[in-house]
């Protein structure tokens, strides 16, 4: 997320853990934090695992499952039904250890520069949507585009993308998407 500084060097001093945070782009690019930590150059990142599904498709379900488990159900699966063990196995194969750090809950469908009335309206739509939600959009004829959070607004304004999902009204307000796109839809595909 753009307001949470996602990459940190952690070190121990006098029995305390101190963390130095770097926002996306300060040390590495927004989509480079996984490799930065997996390589040992940094000790932790905060991010959504669906961004790493290109490295292994197993990452995506730990963030969102379109029209599947709710955020609370994913949390319960991770904590009580074997999800953490699967996550540990997957992350371990990359030299990582993952922890649930919270979630944003049910998300909106997103901001669109054109009206959507049917699935046909998604044909050719360039939308910033990661993870399995992007796979759903592609199956419906749209084009999922990867754009870091801090670049979404400018991409909407320039027309590089036609639509974006982010989080929900509160978070989206601070991103000022209402200035860049006319239509706001619910529910989300992720």
Task: List each language-model region with its residue ranges.
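Short secondary-structure boundary segments
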Residues: 49, 168-169
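Short helix-capping segments at alpha-helix termini
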Residues: 12-16
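Extracytoplasmic small-molecule ligand-binding "clamshell" domains
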Residues: 18-43, 71
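Contiguous mixed-secondary-structure segments that line small-molecule binding/active-site clefts
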Residues: 35, 43, 48-144, 149, ...
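Short terminal or interdomain "cap/linker" segment that borders an active site or interface and mediates
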Residues: 158
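Single conserved hydrophobic/aromatic residue that forms the stacking wall/gate
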Residues: 1-7, 11
